[in-house]
Design a protein with these regions (language model features):
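Alpha-helical transmembrane segments
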Residues: 1-17
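Amphipathic alpha-helical segments that mediate coupling or scaffolding at interfaces
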Residues: 8, 123, 193, 215, ...
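Short extracytoplasmic/periplasmic juxtamembrane "stem" segments immediately C-terminal to an N-terminal membrane anchor
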Residues: 12-28
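Mid-to-C-terminal secondary-structure elements
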Residues: 35-218
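Residue-level recognition of transmembrane alpha-helices
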Residues: 207, 226-229, 260
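N-terminal membrane-entry
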Residues: 217-233
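Hydrophobic transmembrane alpha-helices
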Residues: 231-241
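Intracellular coupling helices
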Residues: 239-271
Length: 271
């Protein structure tokens, strides 16, 4: 169990979750998200900011029945995981770009474009995907880039084919990347800004790392119980050995006393 937990803790997720905080997009942020993000980026200690649909640690939406350019066969439908994100999502989480480009405001509306992960390109058997199209939900979208695989669920789940679309209006979770060592000051600055938009709503930010740790609560409890039971077993074993040697020593003492009474020499007692 400890080896499993060590593997989970040390495994490369495909992105950097350190010092990423998240909180819900609610209140006035629903209509003024872009303004909030732009202001947040000016706060000392904020390295980048974006938003996404749901928790990065547990993207679970699935869809089937999509078609794409150069599709070999339509007999076996591929299950895709999909997520709606905002600009700067990949930059905020340091997700490596493999080919093409990420979503950018310089290109205007990106609602008809899409980005795939490596797994999606693999199962689609698509060579040189950038510039080709995929039909999602009745709309033909241009593939503008591909990103390296990253874990968006528990480590017990295999990485699935994934597509990412840029629809800021449909995101509901704000992500902010904070410079290490400035957490307290930066969080205070973010809360102050948040209160300017939502004075009556509590600022409830949490670290993304905590979301991932929450995926393994059961394993941690089992590991803790195993530790306690192992300690108890060792103590019981030691007590057993102590009792055994005490009994053996007492028995040997009685034997030596009897042999001395019967006239045994010191040499006889030793050998």
């Amino acid at each position: 169990i400890y080896l499993q937990m060590d593997f989970v803790q040390s495994k490369n997720l495909g992105f950097n979750k350190a010092n990423i905080i998240s909180f819900e997009k609610e209140g006035k942020l629903v209509q003024s998200l872009e303004s909030f993000l732009n202001e947040a980026k000016t706060i000392p200690g904020v390295l980048d900011a974006s938003s996404t649909q749901g928790s990065v640690a547990n993207i679970s939406s699935s869809s089937w029945g999509h078609t794409w350019e150069g599709q070999v066969s339509s007999e076996n439908e591929i299950e895709f995981s999909g997520v709606t994100i905002n600009y700067d999502f990949f930059e905020t989480l340091s997700i490596p770009l493999k080919e093409g480009r990420t979503f950018s405001r310089e290109f205007g509306n990106e609602e008809s474009t899409i980005i795939l992960n490596e797994k999606a390109v693999e199962v689609m058997q698509m060579a040189d995907p950038v510039g080709k199209w995929i039909n999602l939900f009745g709309t033909q979208r241009e593939i503008i880039g591909t990103v390296k695989n990253f874990h968006f669920q528990s480590m017990y789940e295999e990485i699935k084919p994934m597509f990412l679309m840029c629809f800021p209006i449909y995101t509901n979770t704000v992500l902010v990347k904070i410079q290490s060592g400035t957490e307290l000051e930066t969080l205070a600055g973010l809360e102050k800004l948040y209160k300017q938009y939502n004075p009556d709503i509590p600022f409830e930010a949490k670290f993304l790392d905590d979301d991932y740790q929450a995926l393994y609560i059961s394993e941690k409890r089992i590991a803790t119980l195993s530790k306690y039971f192992a300690t108890i077993a060792i103590v019981i074993s030691c007590l057993g050995l102590f009792c055994f040697f005490s009994f053996a020593a007492e028995r040997r003492t009685k034997e030596i006393s009897i042999r001395k009474v019967l006239g045994a020499t010191e040499g006889n007692l030793i050998y």
